[in-house]
A protein has these predicted regions:
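Conserved class I S-adenosyl-L-methionine
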Residues: 1-45
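A short glycine-rich, Lys/Arg-flanked "PGG" loop and its adjoining helix->strand segment in the class I
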Residues: 123-135
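Conserved beta-strand signature within the Rossmann-like core of class I S-adenosyl-L-methionine
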Residues: 136-143
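C-terminal lobe and adjacent flexible extensions of AdoMet/dcAdoMet transferase-like proteins
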Residues: 206-236
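SAM-dependent methyltransferase
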Residues: 143-208
């Protein structure tokens, strides 16, 4: 399977860390409601969320699912720097659809990854969560725009400065199917006013609205509420 994040991996943490810093307190608070059983982090990326998960649940096993080989490089580097956390984290190099999960889950985390799943794959995921999630335990996801196929003009995603160089990312999207857009994300490196490099990645993204998500969850016996930008899912 092609690795759509290969061109983004070296910049990934620089661009996305501010987002994780922003949602960290809310994620920590929700995860304190976890039940018995391992915590599954779907689409863990480079593991930016793992320290928050680990602090919220210091005794839980964590299963980190990440299919991208290039992002797993950053993930294992992070775990190497957190040896105590690494003792509790098992990394599965698969997608959510293929991952073998334990029969009881204490919590599920899936930040900025739902767009990688088709409606059929989402339905399968919700059914698996409904069958495995401990009573009262949360599954925490996020919804990203657009919520339906639409053109999105290029806009900045973020930037960071390391030494003399400035790293930035911007993206645009175009409809590419009944429930899909294709994102085109460009990463640039500048030294002052001089652009040193530019790399663009494209990936398809399945759109889903809040209403669609509520319907899907209801059919699986689940329900959702919003909390500080997070979608918190529980058993009905």
């Amino acid at each position: 399977m092609p690795d759509s994040y290969a061109g983004a991996a070296e910049h990934f943490d620089l661009i996305t860390k501010p987002y994780w810093s922003a949602i960290g307190p809310a994620l920590h608070a929700v995860l304190r409601q976890a039940g018995d059983g391992p915590v599954v982090d779907i689409g863990t990326g480079t593991g930016l969320g793992l320290p928050t998960i680990g602090k919220a649940l210091p005794a839980h096993e964590i299963i980190a699912i990440e299919p991208s080989p290039s992002l797993r490089i950053g993930l294992f580097s992070r775990l190497a720097d957190h040896p105590e956390l690494a003792k509790r984290v098992t990394v599965l190099p698969t997608g959510a659809q293929e991952a073998e999960l334990p029969p009881r889950l204490g919590a599920v985390v899936g930040i900025n990854m739902l767009g990688h799943l088709s409606p059929a794959d989402r339905a399968t995921l919700w059914n698996r969560i409904a069958a495995s999630l401990a009573p009262g335990a949360p599954a925490v996801f996020t919804l990203q725009p657009p919520d339906r196929p639409a053109s999105i003009p290029e806009s900045p995603f973020g930037e960071a400065v390391v030494g003399r160089l400035r790293y930035s990312a911007s993206g645009s999207a175009e409809p590419s199917g009944e429930h899909q857009v294709t994102w085109r994300v460009t990463y640039r490196v500048h030294d002052g006013a001089t652009q040193l490099s530019e790399q663009t990645m494209e990936h398809c993204w399945w759109t889903v609205s809040e209403g669609q998500l509520d319907d899907e969850l209801h059919r699986a016996g689940l329900a959702a509420s919003s909390r500080d930008g997070l979608v918190v899912i529980h058993q009905q």
